[in-house]
Amino acid sequence: MENSSIVKSPNPTIEEQRNEIEKLKNLTGIEEVHVDGAKVNKRKRTFDEQSEITKDYIEYDFSKIEDTKGGYLLEEKKVEDLREKPAERELREQEERQKKLRLAPLNLDPETAPKCFECDSIELDTKYFDIFHCRVCHTCREKYPDKYSLLTKTECKLDYLLTEPELQDQELLPRLLKANPHQQGWSNMMLYLRYQVEEFAKKKWGSMEALDAEFERREVQKKEMKEKKFEKQLLELRKRTRTSNYSRMSIREKRKHVHSYDEEFEKPNEPGVIVQRCKCGLEIEQLEI
């Protein structure tokens, strides 16, 4: 068996180097071979491995793309509008939560389904059940307005003497948000369930009678403060009026006084001393020589 030998020329040509590289690739299975003094032969990428820039076109899933009307398309995640106010965001989240609750399947099992407090009906008001956690149907809600009617935040402050931190705590008093009917850009209108507000007021003040007594005390205190404020303003007005009158009198009626010593008498216990007196009370003494 003869041993084959490869004779390498001292100065191989470029064609010989290429042939040698191809032989090494076939023997070793390597796709890239680095040779000193030669350029690197890189493997070409397949179509799937090409970058987004080198591709002939870019694939988009239009089911995950939203047209923002801004000249470009945004994928997957919806970018939150930074101009949305916190009040608007809170109202939108509440509406989305109520929509999901309305679309949820109704539990028709009479054993496990939640029932109305008043009539045991399973057709509950989803808004009251979701926000106030109150099991009441539409019929009973309209039938008992003294219990299930809604109160504004101002009414809770004035009639039940509740504070702002208490009304902002949703664990104490759940609230229903509605767009402000007076101005669209204003804060949302907050509505509270009447019987929940009354129960919290009883816990805070002890009883409704104690609440009425506190209300009367504050009304009397408010009236006294109002009267004191009025008296203070009246006193300030009188001071300003008196000062202005005096200034006008001093400017218009005040004239230059000229002393006239009409009264003249001798000073007692001091003979020879003559006293002259003016109507304004000024006195001068003269000594007779």
Swiss-Prot record:
BP terms from Gene Ontology = base-excision repair; nucleotide-excision repair; nucleotide-excision repair involved in interstrand cross-link repair; nucleotide-excision repair, DNA damage recognition; UV-damage excision repair
Coiled-coil residues are: none
Q: Which residues bind Zn(2+)?
A: C116, C119, C137, C140
Any GO CC annotation of this UniProt entry: nucleotide-excision repair factor 1 complex
Under InterPro entries, the record lists: DNA-bd_dom_put_sf, XPA/RAD14, XPA_C, XPA_sf, Znf_XPA_CS
Q: What is its main location?
A: nucleus
**unnamed zinc finger locations on the chain:** 116-140
Quote the Pfam families the UniProt record gives: XPA_C, XPA_N
GO MF annotation list: damaged DNA binding; zinc ion binding
For this UniProt record, give its keywords in alphabetical order, as a comma-separated list.
DNA damage, DNA repair, DNA-binding, Metal-binding, Nucleus, Zinc, Zinc-finger
Q: Enumerate the subcellular locations listed in this protein's record, separating them with semicolons.
A: Nucleus
Described by its record, this protein's role is as follows: Involved in nucleotide excision repair (NER). Functional in repair of ultraviolet radiation induced damages and in mitotic mutation avoidance. Binds damaged DNA. Binds specifically to base-base mismatches or small insertion/deletion loops with unpaired nucleotides. Maintains GT repeat stability. Functions as a part of the short-patch excision repair system.
Spell out the subunit comment: Interacts with hrq1.
Q: Which PANTHER family match?
A: DNA REPAIR PROTEIN COMPLEMENTING XP-A CELLS
Q: Which NCBIfam families match?
A: rad14
Of which family is this protein a member?
Belongs to the XPA family.
What name does UniProt use for this protein? DNA repair protein rad14
The organism encoding this protein is Schizosaccharomyces pombe (strain 972 / ATCC 24843) (Fission yeast)
